[in-house]
UniProtKB/Swiss-Prot annotation:
Gene: leuS
InterPro entries, per database record: aa-tRNA-synth_I_CS, aa-tRNA-synth_Ia, Leu-tRNA-ligase, Leu_tRNA-synth_edit, M/V/L/I-tRNA-synth_anticd-bd, Methionyl/Leucyl_tRNA_Synth, Rossmann-like_a/b/a_fold, tRNAsynth_Ia_anticodon-bd
Source organism (scientific name): Bradyrhizobium diazoefficiens (strain JCM 10833 / BCRC 13528 / IAM 13628 / NBRC 14792 / USDA 110)
Reaction catalysed by this enzyme: tRNA(Leu) + L-leucine + ATP = L-leucyl-tRNA(Leu) + AMP + diphosphate
UniProt keyword list: Aminoacyl-tRNA synthetase, ATP-binding, Cytoplasm, Ligase, Nucleotide-binding, Protein biosynthesis
Motif interval(s): 'HIGH' region: 43-53
Cited PANTHER family: LEUCINE--TRNA LIGASE, MITOCHONDRIAL, LEUCYL-TRNA SYNTHETASE
Residues engaged in binding ATP: K633
UniProt xrefs under PROSITE patterns: AA_TRNA_LIGASE_I
Name under which the protein is recorded: Leucine--tRNA ligase
Domain of life per record: Bacteria
Length: 874
């Protein structure tokens, strides 16, 4: 038995260098083998990787190594999502240029990623801040512009007053900027937008084809796209109360059945009718100015107190000319959704009910639950939004909701006002066009020029890329490109007159919406993609990343791929065939008595009579053990990957990340379990070394036959191989590791038997050791390479083909059945797999436990559930 410990610090850099020297992870575009494209979402170069990165990239690496061993041409690239605000903040705070800060961070993080032992094709490395990348992004912007998929429009935007930039609705969290945390304001600005709404229905319908995506992600996208079927209704306005020139108010509703429960109309502060009314009412104008400050995001609207201002305007009910409804300007109605106007039916909408209760407008229920007396059915503080029959609705009374919807639609469609129907069935989507303009320096410049004579002029393709100036300064708030003395001043390419560059840069989500396509041929200097190559390598077979990107990044990428198809860059619609969302790495939090957090490395944990106790290492003071939460710098519950790799090695970190819980769930960091992973590494190392000694008696050729011991070991080895193969393909990595541990235990028991093994068993030991090393090689590649050499194998295990499963060995000779008497378990019986029912029955009835349970009673019948249970009924 070997007494030498496995030395990860010596082994891991050596094997990483060997992989690089042989370039075994470099994918060739002309490789004739079937392709497999695995990609983890590329990181932002913040300066250091965190432990979540280790988990994310290890998951993808296991799959990449496995598929390479299975004979695929694996594309497994890496790059950097390198534009963004932190670089500008660093420029301001640390007086360092964003470019220098970013590339220094890339170098540091690349070194860290290499230390994990990832099988990455670094020859395809890209950084989105490099002109060689964003040149092609600018080219596609111009292609989209020509195709009508990009345009400039004036629109209400979410303005972050701290970062001084526009935010998409998705980037506003609880009314605050997603990076700065500042309260978001509403402003009207010229914005460049991508016309994602042209694909609303297609993006929605295609979700049904993505059967290798998590259901929760598809549901989130469905909800965000937000398809709704309803009725556009034209309410006439009472001319005696309405500003000149206004005659009707259009609303879109998904509940036309509730029209007879209407108590008010509400319009957005940006609605033309509100503007017209405010022109003659200073108090209304003041109210509108106040509510505009809260922003345009739905999250803000939902949490704000419901406020309204009665304009004095009255709308006429479409089924009763004498019924007039007050028109309010309300802070919960957005111009961007529907028509910017609603009718309020408070009895059946909680928001509307809260509003009428505040302004004493009353409510009339028009849908009554089945079985309830309509006369006694009232609404007070809780709206009823369930099913039922129509009441208080004149000609609709007694109908179901769906019948009433259809009846209202038919009547209003047949009624004309000014040659147009009063009602029209429509489909609406919640999805809005993607505003990409950002008032920031460190982003991809938008390649257009503003000329006072020619208006907006695209930068000629020959002049791309439009590069960022390296000498920008950040001593003023706002966009450094605006402040630059020369960069924005140019000559118009059409008329030759003085003009200015667009100083907005693109939303960084644009950068990450097509990088996966660039990876297929990053050497093409003339076009974003080489279509023949991209069409062969795409879609990505397995994409891996956090669920926090389920809406923004994934939806934008799906749109971008369609836009690239429309402009000739790719030939597919969906970029990601398979999507996997990994869980987070979480950790306990630790706090002093004053509430301040301390790092795990500063805490000593002891087990006592009252459970776990934590103390501060430096002072011995008691520390409160808090909740298990997502790792964050603010709560100091982070673990530095470098420390773990330095102490235990990368393979231990990788094994722990894979073994503790299913990969789609959070994994709780545990020093004890990390130490357990380290012990398992040493155990494998000893086991492989021991197997070499015991395998020396093995004949060079495979024996013609195997005895019982050798057959049992071979069954265990090939059974483990079959299970691990299946579970890797299912991405059930924690289950794979459990099977490897199970086989390790069985193999260890064989190796510990006294004496020298017979020749056939020695051959089986040698085979089993090779299979074992290959089983854990995707998870612990450095240890596997070291063991591969110990076994005397040629080449690298990273180049070896995956072992072939001998399926004859998977057939069990016997099966163990649970034995019951009158439904209660009395024991077990093992019989031949091929045994017939009479043989099974005889074996069961011969058991002493069965005879004792029957206590002399006659057997009435024996029920046999094949390969599971035998129940004796007495």
């Amino acid at each position: 038995m070997t007494s030498e410990r496995y030395n990860a610090r010596d082994s891991e850099p050596r094997w990483q260098a060997a992989w690089d020297e042989k370039a075994i992870f470099v994918s060739k575009n002309d490789d004739s083998r079937p392709k497999y494209y695995v990609l983890e979402m590329f990181p932002y170069p913040s300066g250091r990787i965190h432990i979540g990165h280790v988990r994310n990239y290890t998951l993808g690496d296991v799959l990449a190594r496995f598929m390479r061993a299975k004979g695929f041409n694996v594309l497994h690239p890496m790059g950097w999502d390198a534009f963004g605000l932190p670089a500008e903040n660093a420029a301001i705070e640390r007086k360092v240029a964003p470019k220098a800060w970013t590339y220094d961070n890339i170098a540091a993080m690349k070194k860290q990623l290499r230390s994990i032992g990832l099988s990455l094709d670094w020859s395809r490395e890209i950084a989105t801040c490099d002109p060689s990348y964003y040149k092609h992004q600018q080219k596609m912007f111009l292609d989209f512009l020509r195709a009508g998929l990009a345009e400039r429009e004036k629109r209400k935007v979410n303005w972050d007053p701290v970062d001084m930039t526009v935010l998409a609705n998705e980037q506003v969290i609880d009314g605050k900027g997603w990076r700065s945390g500042a309260i978001v304001e509403q402003r009207e600005m010229n914005q460049w937008v991508f016309k994602i709404t042209k694909y609303s229905q297609e993006l929605l319908s295609a979700l049904d084809t993505l059967d290798r995506w998590p259901d929760k992600v598809r549901l989130m996208q469905r909800n965000w796209i937000g398809r709704s079927e309803g009725l556009l209704v034209r309410f006439a306005l009472d001319q005696a109360t309405t500003p000149a020139g206004e005659s009707e108010l259009k609303i879109f509703t998904t509940r036309p059945d509730t029209l007879f429960g209407a108590k008010f109309m509400a319009i957005s502060a940006d609605h033309p009718l509100a503007t017209a009314a405010a022109a003659k009412d200073p108090k209304l104008a003041e109210f509108i100015a106040e509510i505009k400050k809260i922003g345009t995001a739905q999250e803000i609207i939902d949490t704000a107190e419901k406020q309204g201002f009665d304009t004095g305007i009255r709308a006429i009910h479409p089924f009763d000319p004498s019924w007039k409804l007050p028109v309010y300007v309300a802070n919960f109605v957005l111009m961007e959704y529907g028509t910017g106007a609603i009718f309020g039916c408070p009895a059946h909408d909680q928001r509307d009910l809260d509003f009428v209760n505040k302004y004493n407008l009353g409510n009339t229920p028009v849908v009554c639950p089945e079985g309830q007396d309509p006369k006694s059915f009232v609404i007070t503080d809780t709206a009823y939004d369930g099913d039922g029959r129509m009441i208080n609705s004149r000609f609709l009374d007694g109908m179901t909701i769906e019948q009433a919807k259809d009846e209202v639609a038919k009547r209003l469609e047949s009624e004309l006002r000014g040659n147009a129907p009063v009602g029209e069935r429509q489909v609406n989507f919640r999805l809005r066009d993607w505003g990409i303009s950002r008032q920031r320096y460190w982003g991809c410049p938008i390649p257009v020029i503003h000329c006072p004579t020619c208006d907006v002029v695209p930068v000629p393709d020959a002049d791309l890329p439009v590069k960022l100036p390296d000498d920008a300064t950040f001593d003023k708030p706002g966009n450094a490109l605006d402040h630059h003395p020369t960069w924005k001043h140019v000559t118009c390419p059409q008329c030759g007159g003085k003009a200015q560059r667009e100083t907005d840069t693109m939303d960084t989500f644009v950068d990450s919406s097509w990088y996966f396509a660039r990876f297929t041929d990053p050497w093409n200097e003339n076009a974003p993609t080489t279509p023949a190559v991209a069409n062969r390598m795409l879609p990505i077979d397995q994409y891996i990343g956090g669920v926090e990107h389920a809406i923004l990044h994934l939806l934008y990428s799906r749109f971008f791929t369609r836009a690239m198809k429309a402009t000739g860059h790719v030939a597919l619609d969906e970029p990601f065939a398979g999507m996997f969302t990994q869980g987070m790495v979480v950790h306990e939090t630790y706090q002093k008595a004053d509430g301040s957090y301390v790092q795990p490395a500063e805490v000593k944990i002891e087990l006592g009579g009252n459970g776990r106790r934590a103390t501060l290492l430096t002072t011995g003071e008691d520390i409160q053990i808090g909740a298990i939460e997502k790792m964050s710098k603010s709560k100091k519950n982070t673990v530095d990957p470098d420390d773990i790799i330095e102490t235990y090695g990368a393979d231990v970190a990788r094994w722990f990340m894979l073994s503790d819980s299913p990969p789609d769930r959070d994994v709780i960091w545990s020093d004890e379990r990390v130490q357990g992973a380290s012990r398992f590494v040493q155990r494998l190392w000893r086991l492989v070394n021991d197997s070499v000694e015991l395998g020396k008696a093995a004949p060079a050729a495979r024996p013609a036959s195997f005895g019982a011991d050798a057959t049992a070991l071979r069954k265990a080895a090939h059974g483990a191989l079959d299970k691990v193969t299946t579970e890797i393909e299912r991405l059930h990595f924690n289950v794979c590791l459990a099977h490897i541990r199970e086989f390790t235990n069985a193999f260890s028991e064989v190796l510990q038997r006294p004496g020298q093994p017979a020749a056939d068993l020695a051959w089986a030991i040698r085979e089993a050791s090779q299979i074992l090393v290959q089983l854990f090689s995707p998870m612990m590649p450095h240890l596997a390479e070291e063991c591969w050499q110990v076994l005397g194998q040629k080449g690298l295990v990273s180049e070896a083909n995956w072992p072939q499963i001998e399926r004859d060995l998977l057939v069990e000779d016997s099966v163990t059945l649970v034995v019951q008497v009158n439904g209660k378990k009395r024991g077990e019986v093992t019989v031949a797999t091929a045994a017939q029912n009479p043989e099974i029955e005889a074996a069961v009835l011969a058991l002493d436990a069965v005879k004792l349970a029957l206590d002399g009673k006659p057997v009435r019948k024996v029920i046999i559930v094949p390969k599971r249970i035998v129940n004796v009924v007495g």
